[in-house]
Design a protein with these regions (language model features):
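Flexible glycine-/small-residue-enriched beta->alpha junction loops
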Residues: 143-178
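Conserved beta-strand in the GNAT
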Residues: 61, 67-76, 91, 96, ...
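Hydrophobic, small-residue-rich alpha-helical packing segments that form membrane-like cores
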Residues: 22-26, 34, 105
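Active-site rim helix/loop that mediates acceptor-substrate recognition in acyltransferases
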Residues: 37-81, 85, 196-224, 323-324
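Conserved acetyl-CoA-binding loop-helix of GNAT-fold acetyltransferases
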Residues: 94-97, 102-119, 264-276
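Conserved active-site alpha-helix within GNAT-family acetyltransferase domains
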Residues: 119-124, 129-150, 270, 290-307
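Intrinsically disordered, low-complexity, positively biased terminal segments
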Residues: 1-28, 82, 164-432
């Protein structure tokens, strides 16, 4: 649908409302509608940050008699994918439907208009972090990355053995804002090494610093510890501490880890030791870590590191051949995929994928399929964190020749589990 407010005609006629592009001067009512749909107040500094990050030209609204009934936004990201490339990716967010618009096709119309726009714009991938998990599968999004939440009894856990040379790591607690450039330089080096990470650009580097008092829940302001080796920044951790006292006047504080990164295992071990040994605390909560978190192989007693695995990043292939050619493959693959995609018919059909560690070619074909799946399942497999074998076990992928599941699983695999370090869904911003 064009930005002129012309009626959307996909599916049944809907004469009472239409989908429009957001006029540049309408950000405030648009965002107010988003807040209303999420049923929660928001600190002024959070609203201000979203105002600076928002891209009104990429936002859509559904209006009925002038009132906003539905919203959808898109952020311009660059995401790391298997092979180390960082590619243009549409970050879908601020999707909402007011109560009066439910069961009337509003969400479907927004998703339809948005996907058509993404295709015209040339982004091969769209991603989102869902506030409600069941919503987006019917629009072609598949769960591609999970996150690990750790609840650690820190008085019962120590690093099993210091990493060799860890005593050579220098630690210093620094102001998070003043240390931002150093942290971002390190993050940029790590970005290509793990699929699913977004480049911190256009103000997104400020999201980890977001720390409104109303969201602290008794914690002190966020702090930052920097790890240095041989005069360079080798790691950092941002965290907050909430100290509580028991009835026996014993300190039972909690360290809440916002993020912790390092490019050297010695620096990583030193940072975790610092966190685990924080005075006046007995608990460490790390709500968003990769599922292949190295800490679990460092600690003396993993049973006191209680894990919870959650869904995180959902991936949608907007343009199948461009998306599959953007990444590389861990082992050689030559296969025909039969992909179902009713919501994006340009993706529907059979595709021959030939690829290896250097690159890939993906073209339409009439050859018999080796694998049949829908586009959401392909999105789940894209970053290498969900295998074709497990999707087949769930009935999401069907193999038509022996051995192809093992071949596809190996080819699409990633050395590091995909992970999204920060949420860009408004309701999932860090509340530590």
């Amino acid at each position: 649908m064009s930005s002129t407010g012309e009626l959307v005609t996909h599916g049944s006629p809907l004469p009472d409302w239409d989908v429009q592009s957001l006029p540049p001067d309408q950000w405030q009512p648009f965002y107010a509608a988003v807040l209303g749909a999420f049923h929660e107040p928001e600190p002024d500094e959070v609203t201000a940050l979203w105002g600076s990050l928002g891209e009104p030209r990429r936002c859509l609204v559904v209006r009925e008699r002038g009132a906003i009934m539905g919203t959808a936004g898109t952020f311009s990201f660059r995401m790391s994918i298997p092979g180390g490339r960082v590619v243009d990716t549409a970050g879908v967010s601020m999707v909402s439907v007011q109560a009066v618009g439910r069961r009337r096709g509003v969400l479907t119309a927004l998703m339809r208009q948005q996907l058509d726009s993404l295709r015209r714009g040339g982004e091969p991938l769209a991603v989102l972090t869902a506030s409600e998990a069941p919503i987006y599968g019917r629009f072609g999004y598949g769960m591609a990355a999970r996150q690990l939440s750790l609840d650690i009894a820190s008085r019962r856990v120590r690093l099993a053995a210091p990493a060799v040379g860890s005593d050579e790591v220098g630690l210093s607690v620094e102001d998070p804002h003043k240390a931002l450039d150093a942290c971002e330089e390190l993050y940029g080096r790590l970005l290509p090494q793990r699929p699913g990470m977004m480049a911190h650009e256009n103000g997104w580097e400020l999201v980890p610093l977001l720390d409104p008092p109303a969201w602290r829940d008794g914690s002190a302001p966020v702090e930052c510890v920097i790890a240095r080796m041989d005069g360079r920044v080798a790691g950092y951790a941002r965290y907050s501490v909430a100290v509580e006292w028991s009835r026996t006047n014993t300190a039972e504080g909690t360290v809440r880890v916002r993020d912790i990164e390092a490019d050297d295992p010695r620096a990583y071990a030193a940072l975790w030791r610092f966190i685990l040994e924080t005075d006046l605390t007995s608990r460490v909560i790390a709500p968003n870590r990769p599922v292949d978190e190295a800490l679990l192989h460092m600690v003396s007693d993993v049973r006191h590191c209680t894990p919870t695995v959650l869904d995180s990043l959902y991936v949608r292939l907007v343009d199948i051949p461009r998306a599959l050619c953007a990444r590389t493959y861990a082992t050689a693959i030559d296969t025909v995929l039969e992909v179902g995609d009713r919501f994006a018919p340009w993706n529907q059909g059979r595709w021959r994928l030939t690829g290896d560690g250097e690159g890939a070619v993906c073209t339409r074909t009439h050859d018999a399929p080796d694998l049949s799946l829908d586009v959401a399942a392909l999105g789940s497999a894209y970053l290498g964190g969900v295998t074709f074998s497990e999707l087949a076990a769930a009935g999401r992928v069907h193999a038509h020749r022996p051995g192809i599941l093992a071949t596809a699983t190996a080819a699409f695999s990633s050395a590091s589990a995909p992970w999204m370090p920060f949420a860009f869904c408004r309701s999932l911003l860090p509340r530590l």
